Design a protein with these regions (language model features):
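Transmembrane catalytic cores of multi-pass membrane glycosyltransferases
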Residues: 1-3, 142, 149-154, 178-183, ...
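Active-site lumenal/periplasmic loops and adjacent helix-entry segments of GT-C-fold
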Residues: 114-262, 494-499
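Extracytoplasmic
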Residues: 459-460, 466, 476, 480-634
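Membrane-embedded, hydrophobic transmembrane alpha-helices
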Residues: 1-122, 339-346, 447-450
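Membrane-interface alpha helices of multi-pass inner-membrane proteins
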Residues: 52, 279-295
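Hydrophobic/aromatic-rich transmembrane helices and adjacent perimembrane loops
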Residues: 155, 210-213, 299-300, 418-462
Length: 765
């Protein structure tokens, strides 16, 4: 992770510093240091996405663009006119912050703004700022402790990333012909990072996603530091779970698109006399960049613009109304372009699709689950700040987002493609739409030094900041929550069973080297091979964004697998198949005389076609709770992704708690000479052993104790009968851990304990 941080800082810090200087000439080094990583990363996303959109992306051209961007940034921050009065507005403000006096007489506004910002900088609570920065650093904890992320979305992003590395565009991989329609910035920047550091595509996606979250957090600290609420920004973000949960679930583009909110908060939450034309340009640039990352970011920033316009046109000052009209023009241009693309390019393909609500109405229960405490405090903040311009903008921004969530209430509505597109785009908006607006509102109220703008010029702003008792209590809650979150992150780094691929799947990638022809892979998360050797074609691809598929072998190959259509595989030169212990195709191939294991690692298998039908077929038997009286039934987290069950395993698996001695009843078929047990280790128990009084050549064996799926094979003693396997443990007590699957509904246990889940037995003769 350190290498990733160094590369990202080295390439984005100077451009971000320059953009921070332009958008906020009053910023000092501390504020620029907070803003630069986020603004620089936003520019890198926009630049990389633009190159891919223009179909000219390459590693070399990307580096040329990075160098050019840094040269422009260097000139921006170093070149100044010797005559202060002839400098640009942001440069004159910068000079005013350093006590320089311009020759022009029109410096009243500049001096007033400089005075306000200098007061904010003097009143900073540096220890609290330091605490906020440390809290933000926890976003980098997971990629430091583990290699690959949890969730399933990252696998699709990794496949896209690898295609950009190899092909320079989002063409479909393997035996498929077509392309993906997906925002280009994230996969292209991940590809650049992967190529630069020689990283696995999945690792690059993982690290860039968490780096994006970190920069969003410190960027918001920098943006709200302009209002004297920098430290409170991170504390307010800590009251919600939304963006953190989305990052944990590997929804990285949605999180990265929040970088546009940093620009929005920095430029749109300020008095009219402090707004300049380059702020409008900055917002327009941010809209373009976030639209290339993920459309949700552009929608959210667009609604912030709308909120700003709604309150700007009601201000009494004519200058304010002119500014509001200019912003309205900008918003109209982007909205027109966005709707044109949606209606002409994307939406027609969704004409037959109904409005979709995968996770329910996002403005209801999901909002409360992921942002409940933050929402409660924000309601109080909205009341307290109702007479201020900044408070009204933030409140209206949240209200507009909430109204947007109503699209999920009309689930099933057809023939309105724009609504269908919105419902698919915003299917999980409770995790990423409301977190920042609510946190901004809370931070402005939380800070005791914030100076906000009265909505009515003739009136003085009458509002009181958050009571100190409440402020310190909430600070304690956030610190405690951060400690718990860090502890959970450390615990989960030892739970690879939560990954959407098994350890064997990853280990088996090396066996793919040198294979001629194409390889059949399952059309499921564990079947999408993002790191296949160059030239090797696999059959399955992830459904990400809109898939334009003109040719594919996946369906025909799957039918051929289940019907033993060997002619098909010979004609297509598809002589190998790759299966995961997480999937179901393995059971069909194992019992077919036309497929033979070529390489096996912990249940993951590379199969070779045997056209003569002379492969030795094992006997497979499922294990259920009736075979293990001391086990408890636990749901299979992947039960909804398994559509065939020839072993009658059902939706549950027998789970043996660490420290519990148990007997597993088995019945060996006649002629069996070897038994293989497939099991899933939950957590990292000290050690687990299996023994049998008869039936095994060696009566005592140690099983693997690392998290995830494993396969252990034992030679049988054919002169005796085996009826019972006894499992014992080195430790007498199981270790507790917080199981995130209990929150998502994929499991029923939240406060879980370590142990093993039995899957099935394979008898070889």
């Amino acid at each position: 992770m350190l290498g990733t941080v160094l590369v990202m800082l080295a390439t984005s810090m100077l451009p971000g510093w320059a953009l921070a200087s332009v958008l906020d000439g009053s910023s000092d080094r501390l504020r620029k240091g907070l803003l630069a990583p986020s603004l620089g990363l936003l520019l890198l996303y926009g630049m990389s996405g633009t190159l891919l959109l223009l179909k000219v992306w390459s590693i070399g051209l990307m580096w040329v663009a990075v160098v050019a961007l840094n040269l422009v940034a260097y000139r921006t921050v170093t070149i100044r006119n010797e005559v202060v009065a002839q400098r640009s507005h942001w440069q004159r403000l910068e000079a005013a912050m350093h006590g320089e006096v311009a020759e022009s007489a029109a410096n009243t506004t500049l001096s007033k703004e400089a005075e306000t910002q200098l007061r904010f900088q003097r009143q900073r609570n540096l220890p609290l700022m330091g605490i906020g920065f440390v809290i933000a650093l926890t976003a980098l904890l997971s990629p430091t402790l583990q290699t690959l992320p949890f969730g399933v979305d990252w696998i699709g992003f990794a496949v896209l990333t690898q295609q950009v590395v190899l092909q320079g565009e989002l063409v479909l991989s393997g035996t498929n012909v077509g392309f993906w329609t997906y925002p280009p910035a994230y996969p292209s920047l991940s590809a650049w990072l992967a190529a630069t550091l020689n990283l696995d595509a999945g690792v690059a996606v993982f690290r860039l996603g968490h780096w994006s979250l970190f920069t969003v957090l410190i960027g918001l600290m920098g943006a709200l530091d302009r209002h004297g609420a920098g430290a409170q920004a991170m504390l307010a973000m800590g009251l919600g779970l939304g963006l953190f949960a989305k990052t944990f679930d590997s929804g990285y583009p949605s999180v990265a698109s929040q970088l546009g909110m940093v620009v929005g908060v920095l430029t749109l939450f300020r008095p009219t006399d402090q707004r300049q034309r380059y702020h409008t340009v900055g917002v327009g640039l941010a809209l373009w960049c976030v639209a290339l990352i993920h459309p949700t970011g552009a929608i959210y920033l667009g609604l912030l613009l709308l909120s700003h316009v709604l309150h700007g046109v009601n201000m009494e000052d004519e200058t304010q109304r002119v500014w509001a009209r200019n912003v309205a023009y900008l918003a109209s241009i982007f909205i027109t372009i966005g709707f044109t693309v949606a209606l002409l390019v994307v939406a027609p393909r969704l004409f037959e699709e109904a409005v979709f609500s995968e996770y329910g109405w996002q403005g209801g229960r999901p909002l409360l689950v992921y942002n409940g405490p933050l929402l409660a405090v924000a309601c109080l903040a909205a009341i307290a700040l109702r007479q201020t311009l900044e408070g009204s903008i933030a409140t209206t921004w949240f209200a507009l987002l909430w109204l947007l969530s109503l699209v999920h209430i009309v689930e099933g509505l057809q023939h309105v493609p724009v609504l269908s597109l919105l419902s698919y785009t915003l299917y999980s908006m409770a995790l990423h739409a409301f977190h920042v607006p609510l946190a901004v509102l809370v931070a402005l109220w939380w800070s005791p030094t914030t100076a906000l703008t009265a909505k009515v010029q003739a009136n003085e702003t009458t509002w009181k900041p958050m009571p100190q008792v409440v402020a310190w209590s909430l600070t304690g809650v956030v610190l405690l929550g951060t400690l718990v979150a860090a502890t959970v992150a450390v615990q989960l780094s030892h739970h690879d069973e939560l990954l959407a691929v098994s350890p064997g799947d990853l280990a088996l990638r090396d066996a793919l080297e040198g294979i001629d022809g194409s390889v059949y892979t399952e059309n499921m998360h564990w079947g999408y091979v993002w790191n296949a050797p160059a030239g090797l074609e696999t059959t399955s691809i992830p459904t990400l964004g809109l898939v334009h598929l003109t040719q594919s072998e996946q369906s025909a190959a799957t039918r051929a697998v289940y019907s033993d259509n060997i002619t098909y595989f010979l004609e297509k030169n598809m002589r190998h198949a790759l299966t995961s212990p997480l999937g179901t195709v393995q059971w069909t191939l194992a019992t077919s005389p036309f497929w033979e294991p070529m390489a096996q690692v912990d249940g993951a298998t590379l199969w070779a076609l045997k056209p003569e039908g002379d492969a030795i077929t094992p006997v497979l038997t499922g294990i259920d709770e009736s075979d293990c009286s001391d086990c408890t039934a636990r749901l299979d987290p992947w039960r909804d992704h398994k559509f065939r069950d020839p072993l009658n395993l059902g939706r549950e698996r027998p789970f043996l708690l660490e420290g519990t001695t148990a007997d597993l009843e088995v019945e060996a078929p006649s002629g069996a000479i070897e038994m293989c047990l497939v099991y899933e280790v939950i957590g990292s128990p000290d050690a687990v052993y299996v023994n049998a009084s008869s039936g095994l050549e060696r009566p005592f064996h140690a099983l693997q104790a690392t998290a995830g799926y494993h396969q252990s094979c034992f030679a049988l003693n054919t002169s005796s009968t085996m009826e019972v396997l006894t499992f014992t443990w080195k430790s007498e007590e199981a270790a507790g851990w917080l199981n995130p699957l209990g929150l998502s509904g994929r499991d029923t246990v939240l406060f879980d304990r370590t142990g093993i889940k039995f899957q099935w037995l394979e008898w070889r003769s």
